[in-house]
Design a protein with these regions (language model features):
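Phosphate-ester processing/binding pockets and catalytic centers
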Residues: 74-76, 88, 101
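Conserved catalytic cores of phosphodiester-cleaving nucleases, focusing on short active-site segments
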Residues: 83-85, 91-99, 118
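Catalytic cores of nucleic-acid endonucleases
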Residues: 100-178
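Short, low-complexity, polybasic intrinsically disordered segments
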Residues: 146-216
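Beta-rich catalytic cores
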Residues: 79
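A hydrophobic membrane-anchoring alpha-helix module
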Residues: 11-14, 218-222
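Acidic-basic catalytic patches of nuclease active cores, encompassing PD-(D/E)XK
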Residues: 1-74
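Generic surface-pattern signal
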Residues: 17, 127, 177, 197-200, ...
Length: 222
């Protein structure tokens, strides 16, 4: 029996093929963590390298082409996170890798911009597939009732920011400690608090090693 993730991969492949732009949409987390500017991968697993959906590939090679006359250009593509997964419990994960300090203004702005944009264009695709009777939320999640897209994102979608190990600082440690103790997060991570309050079920940050131990090691497709 196919996992919800595998069925979602097939759904997006169907969308890409019907749009006339068949592409390879899956890559490993290691591959998707590549920092192009410095030619370094932010994440390497000691346990297992999960296959995941490349949101950048779909945004740049399919969505951009549909709206810009067949052009596959990064500068006209909608913003997107690096990776997307669905686990055995039916939760959806939007994952962004950054080889920068969490205190960086660019990191914070990118996370907010990419989250909003990616949710919008992905759910626009899902709306098109739903109109063709090829998609329903209950087939790709643990949702058992009819639900609006906005409610679905808030109840079943989670955001994860992964910071490179050599960019871990006191600010990241304070955020992690506050999260574990279920205390109010520092003002410096207000962008995560906003994402969790307004968009996602949760918004978390890990170092690459923490992500490996606490998420990847425990992750199950089915």
């Amino acid at each position: 029996m196919m996992s919800m993730y595998e069925k979602f991969v097939n759904l997006l492949n169907t969308y890409c093929n019907q749009a006339g732009y068949p592409i390879q949409i899956e890559k490993t987390l290691h591959e998707l963590s590549l920092d192009d500017a410095n030619s370094v991968n932010v994440f390497t697993s000691e346990y297992k390298d999960l296959n995941s959906i490349s949101m950048d590939s779909i945004a740049q090679n399919v969505v951009a082409r549909i709206h810009f006359g067949g052009q596959s250009r990064k500068d006209v593509a909608p913003a997107s996170v690096d990776s997307f997964l669905i686990d055995s419990n039916g939760y959806w994960y939007f994952i962004e890798f950054k080889n920068q300090y969490i205190s960086s203004k660019k990191v914070k702005e990118d996370c907010v911009k990419k989250s909003y944009a990616n949710v919008f264009w992905l759910f626009k695709i899902l709306d098109e597939m739903q109109r063709k009777q090829l998609f329903s939320f209950d087939a790709y999640s643990s949702c058992t009732t009819e639900i609006s897209p906005f409610e679905f994102v808030k109840k079943y979608c989670k955001f994860i920011l992964v910071i490179g190990n050599d960019k871990v600082d006191n600010e990241l440690n304070r955020i992690r400690e506050a999260k574990k103790a279920k205390m109010t997060m520092p003002d410096s991570c207000r962008f995560l608090r906003k994402l969790e309050s307004y968009v996602f079920k949760s918004a978390d940050v890990y170092s690459a090693d923490q992500f490996d131990r606490e998420f990847v090691k425990k992750f199950r497709y089915s």
